[in-house]
């Protein structure tokens, strides 16, 4: 059976809109955006997006039966509609775990299902390790553990052989002497105070989910 976009569309639940949206201040600097869809009285499930640096997508709602689940989504610090956008200060894994607990407490939820994809699968596991009594179940998809070997495959030497046409512009933007460590090279540019350098850096698409 050939899997197509149409095939995937047929097996997912219908598209729905969020019925409630809001923001939660989680630190003196960061405020995270959240939304809820599905059944307000249903089984709570928190959806943890990928990246790091991605954002929650409307399509994620379609993994769940909207008549049975209270679907909770949020944008992690610096992502999506959360503010300040793209802020790295006070933005780390432990802060994200803390934010999940603040969201849970904000909604008055005792326990919830945890659903994470890509980087979100890593964050889901860390959250579950730190707060096992708050987790009804774990669902992990597109598992990405953020290990050095995985980062190297995705950003340096691995995906480059599978999708060479997509990889070449990302690689070739960096001067040849720096191409041995593309993550380091891009980090230096994207955190630079040189505005000209910052805005000439392309934004490679994050397809990790």
PLM regions: where:
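N-terminal cap/lid segment of alpha/beta-hydrolase-fold proteins
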Residues: 10-31
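Single conserved hydrophobic/aromatic residue that forms the stacking wall/gate
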Residues: 199-209
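Conserved alpha/beta-hydrolase catalytic His-Asp/Glu region
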Residues: 177-201
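Catalytic nucleophile-loop/oxyanion-hole region of alpha/beta-hydrolase
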Residues: 85-96, 149-157
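Conserved acidic catalytic loop of the alpha/beta-hydrolase fold
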Residues: 97-111
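Conserved hydrolase catalytic core segment
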Residues: 111-149
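A catalytic-pocket lid/entrance helix-loop region that shapes and gates access to the active site
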Residues: 136-182
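Conserved HGGG/HGGXW glycine-rich cap/lid loop of the alpha/beta-hydrolase fold
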Residues: 29-84
């Amino acid at each position: 059976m050939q899997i197509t976009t149409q095939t995937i569309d047929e097996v997912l639940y219908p598209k729905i809109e969020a019925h409630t949206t809001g923001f939660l201040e989680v630190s003196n600097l960061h405020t995270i955006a959240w939304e809820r869809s599905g059944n307000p009285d249903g089984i709570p499930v928190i959806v943890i997006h990928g990246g790091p640096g991605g954002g929650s997508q409307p399509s994620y709602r379609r993994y769940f039966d909207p008549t049975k689940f209270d679907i909770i989504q949020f944008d992690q610090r610096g992502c999506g509609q959360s503010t300040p956008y793209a802020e790295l200060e006070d933005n780390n894994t432990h802060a994200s775990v803390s934010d999940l607990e603040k969201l849970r407490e904000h909604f008055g939820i005792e326990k919830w299902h945890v659903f994470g994809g890509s980087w979100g699968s890593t964050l889901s596991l860390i959250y579950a390790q730190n707060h096992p009594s708050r987790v009804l179940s774990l669902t992990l998809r597109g598992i990405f553990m953020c290990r050095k070997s995985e980062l190297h495959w995705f950003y340096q030497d691995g995906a480059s052989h599978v999708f060479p046409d997509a990889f070449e512009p990302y690689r070739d933007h960096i001067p040849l002497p720096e191409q041995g460590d593309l993550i380091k090279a891009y980090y230096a540019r994207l955190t630079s105070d040189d505005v000209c350098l910052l805005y000439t850096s392309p934004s490679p698409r994050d397809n990790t989910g």
